[in-house]
Amino acid sequence: MEKDPSQEQDVSSDYPIIHQQLITAKSKWEKEVLSELPKIDERNFPIAHPDFPITQLPARDAKTIGGIIRSNRWPNCSFYTSWKKEEDKIYWKGEVLTAGQYQPVIYYTCAEENVGLTINISDKNKILTRTKIKEAFHPPLRGMEYDKIERGESYVKDWNPLVLNPISLSKGPIELALTASDIQGGQAIDFRLMTLERVVTK
């Protein structure tokens, strides 16, 4: 590792026994573990696990409909932007594990000219709660000041928490979605994360 920190040199012929051990271990893992995993994971996102009072629903794990785009192809630290139409949607196909009342908090940024829009939380087409964006919060991206070369991953920024009225969730499948209405200035919010904190258990 010290002589070749970038690991560019093939040293398998210098260490044939270790090389064969690694090949055997990989083959065993593929047969015993990888073979049991689906090529496409269709499991629903777990929401409201009984052992955890707060569920995090990040942009990283969400899907979208419409013109909303991710800040970067790499999901970690990414956020959603270019949210311009009422038909646009951010959603999670989830599974509620514990029924109850939950307090949503949305982490967003919004330019001054876009203040006044309404954010809706829904299950499929049923509105669970909604609120108006009354406060502008529009900090710049940061992180590039620490880079010696341009990073491939998303830059980050600070986010403003917005507390919404509690919502009632029943146990079972759910398609939890965010939509925007009364969009001002041709743009809704940038979105990073929604949390759901359990306040009452059914």
Question: What annotation goes with each model-predicted range?
Answer:
Residues 4-14, 19-202:
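Extracytoplasmic
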Residues 1:
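Extracellular, beta-strand-rich glycan-interacting domains
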